[in-house]
Amino acid sequence: MKMKYYFVIFFLILAMFLVGCGGGVTPATDEAKIKSVISEFCLAINDQNWSKAKSYCVYGSEEYYQACYIEDMFNTYHLYCDLVTINFYIDIDNVSISGDYSEVYGYLTLVMSACGEIYNDSGYFWQYLQKVGNTWKIYS
């Protein structure tokens, strides 16, 4: 009789764990999506994947053309230098969301080297994003 109760209790506990692990995926919050877009944008710049970097921007926006400018600058340096590297990082301090628009405050670091010269730029900045459909895109 005791063995029966153990099996029932074991089965109930197992059922509770399996229901808790039902495979349901928690949807990412808008803040997580925004941080991901900015992180992926930086990675695309670092990988020199210009089309991917621009895909994280609103087409024709200030940030879209900034990515085009970085690409042109990078390609121009490549005409004169064999090795050109770029490291672009953003450390996000705050994300504020208002409807389909978001403001991100953080610290930006850009290090580019070409022909033995190093170009550094860093400082605090504001980044602005717009929700297009279900996707956040950088516009300024």
Regions found by a protein language model. Name each.
Residues 1-19:
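Sec-dependent bacterial lipoprotein signal peptides
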Residues 40, 44, 65, 71-78, ...:
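A generic structural signal for ordered secondary structure
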Residues 1-3, 32, 130:
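Generic cytosolic/nucleocytoplasmic N-terminal low-complexity/intrinsically disordered segments
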Residues 35-36, 50-97, 101:
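Short solvent-exposed beta->alpha transition segments
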Residues 82-84, 94-140:
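Exposed beta-sheet edge and beta->alpha loop/turn motif
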Residues 11-15, 45, 78, 92, ...:
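Prokaryotic Sec-type signal peptides and long signal-anchor helices
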Residues 10-11, 20-47, 55:
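Short, low-complexity N-terminal intrinsically disordered segments enriched in polar/charged residues
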